[in-house]
A protein has these predicted regions:
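Anion-binding and metal-coordination hotspots
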Residues: 1-300
Length: 300
């Protein structure tokens, strides 16, 4: 990326952000409510204790090895259910916070469930309208190119509110923030736009249409200085011109789909992030080679 930036082929001051949903390595039937998880945890602990007694009582070495393997599998089951219960507590805490801000919507939701296969993954709405265990992979790219600057798998079902946390991670990595940041309408969040304005970042994402059918670019009561500047920016021809370069980031997702990134074969956010990073590296190697060869031809 440093070489491409030095050649003027990419501009790290202008980034695009988009999300791609990829099926997780967890079954829809692996999701359990609190009562079921606690029951499974008690059963798993009973199995561990029973297997310990069997291994101690059986003097045969081969049978001991088989028993030890079964015992290890039972311990791993206990660990997974324990992790699921810990994750469930986080989900329940999030629901309690939502009750304070949007009580009607929170009350409509069913009792939270967590997967015993991969407690970190949530059920998300997919592009085909179905609901399946999946990761919301956030991809940051140099706007107007297919060069990936960063990847982060998230469990959030909505892109709203993900601009700030992703850019904070990018600042940790590169030591800087972009001057302009492009994202689709699903990322539009007043808090993120105000934060970006305070950091000197111009956000380009389409404003959401109001339920009354008014012009979404017109100022509204309660708008802060950052949101006011953003609405004015998106109403201008220059703002629309800048935003058009965001569309190219969709090509990255299409390329990864062609590489069969349909479903992750690993579990846990850290391992999923590693798979996404390998795809990003492969993507950047191919795209950088193409861009540098074109640059040499034009400068020859």
């Amino acid at each position: 990326m440093a070489t491409l930036a030095a050649c003027g082929l990419i501009d790290l001051g202008k980034l695009a952000q988009d999300g791609v949903r990829v099926r997780a390595s967890a079954g829809a039937t692996s999701y359990r409510r609190r009562a079921t998880l606690e029951e499974h945890l008690a059963q798993a602990r009973d199995v561990v204790e029973q297997l310990k007694r069997e291994v101690d009582d059986d003097p045969a070495a081969s049978n001991q090895r088989i028993g030890a393997a079964r015992q290890r599998a039972a311990r791993e089951r206990v660990e997974r259910v324990d992790a699921a219960l810990a994750k469930l507590r986080e989900v329940e805490a999030q629901r309690e916070r939502r009750l304070k801000t949007n009580r009607k919507q929170a009350e409509k939701q069913k009792e939270p469930r967590v997967s015993t296969t991969d407690p970190e993954v949530r059920i998300l709405k997919m592009a085909d309208g179905g609901f399946r265990p999946a990761w919301n992979g956030q991809v940051i790219s140099a706007a107007g190119t297919s060069i990936v600057a960063g990847v982060t798998p998230c469990a959030e079902g909505s892109d709203r509110g993900l601009i700030r946390p992703i850019l904070d991670k990018l600042r940790t990595r590169f030591g800087r923030l972009p001057e302009r940041h492009l994202a689709d309408g699903g990322f539009t969040a007043a808090n993120d736009i105000e934060w970006a304005h305070g950091e000197g970042i111009e956000v380009y994402c389409p404003p959401t249409q109001s339920k009354h059918g008014g012009d979404p670019c017109q100022p509204r009561a309660g708008d802060g200085p950052g949101v006011l500047a953003w609405r004015s920016r998106m109403a201008s021809q220059e703002g629309k011109r800048q935003y058009r370069s965001r569309a190219i980031c969709e090509c990255i997702h299409a390329r990864w789909r062609n590489w069969n990134l349909i479903r992750f074969n690993v579990r846990g956010q850290a391992k999923v992030a590693a798979v996404m990073l390998w795809h990003a590296l492969a993507n950047n190697i191919l795209q950088a080679d193409r861009m540098l060869r074109g640059h040499r031809i034009t400068t020859a």
